[in-house]
């Protein structure tokens, strides 16, 4: 299965940069000392920059459904174990081996609205992670252990 996810603004991102813009605008607008106005300009600038670069949500290109992403890292020796587990029973992955290496990355895209989750295994090659398994679709209830 070929799925493509693109980065988009999440609700949390929008709330953060709008509140920075509003707070910065208020600090600039009130007649106060120069230090308060400078702080207001700094908050306005930070809000504008975050509006441009902060994108923590993911959207499925085909369905336009929004997803969250969870990444888990494992050592190379876990490759076959994890590849077999995500193909049949993803809850059987041993999370005690997590963060003992970063040669294998497990990407989990999940949505509580749709109740779906997509899992893919990626392998580190110099400077990037390349997919080394198919994208598997599961119900959210089957992978609760992986997204906690």
Please give the residue ranges for each predicted region.
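Hydrophobic alpha-helical transmembrane segments
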Residues: 16, 31-46
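Transmembrane alpha-helices and immediately adjacent membrane-cytoplasm interface residues
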Residues: 43-62
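Hydrophobic, membrane-inserted alpha-helices
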Residues: 19-27
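Cytosolic juxtamembrane segments of membrane proteins
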Residues: 58-105
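Juxtamembrane interface helix immediately N-terminal to a transmembrane segment
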Residues: 2-18
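Amphipathic, interaction-prone secondary-structure segments
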Residues: 95-116, 123
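Mixed-charge, Lys/Arg-enriched low-complexity segments
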Residues: 1-7, 57, 78, 142-148
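A membrane-cytosol interface segment of integral membrane proteins
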Residues: 115-148
């Amino acid at each position: 299965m070929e799925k493509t996810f693109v980065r988009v603004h999440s609700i949390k991102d929008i709330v953060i940069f709008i509140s920075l813009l509003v707070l910065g605008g208020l600090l600039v607008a009130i007649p106060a000392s120069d230090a308060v106005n400078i702080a207001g300009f700094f908050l306005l600038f930070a809000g504008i920059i975050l509006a441009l670069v902060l994108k923590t949500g993911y959207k499925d290109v085909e369905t336009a459904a929004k997803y969250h992403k969870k990444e888990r890292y494992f050592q190379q020796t876990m490759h076959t174990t994890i590849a077999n587990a995500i193909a049949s029973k993803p809850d059987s992955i041993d999370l005690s081996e997590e963060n003992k290496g970063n040669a294998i990355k497990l990407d989990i895209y999940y949505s509580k609205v749709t109740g779906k989750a997509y899992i893919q295994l990626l392998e580190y090659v110099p400077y990037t992670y390349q997919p080394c398994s198919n994208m598997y679709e599961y119900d959210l209830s089957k992978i609760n252990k992986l997204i906690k």
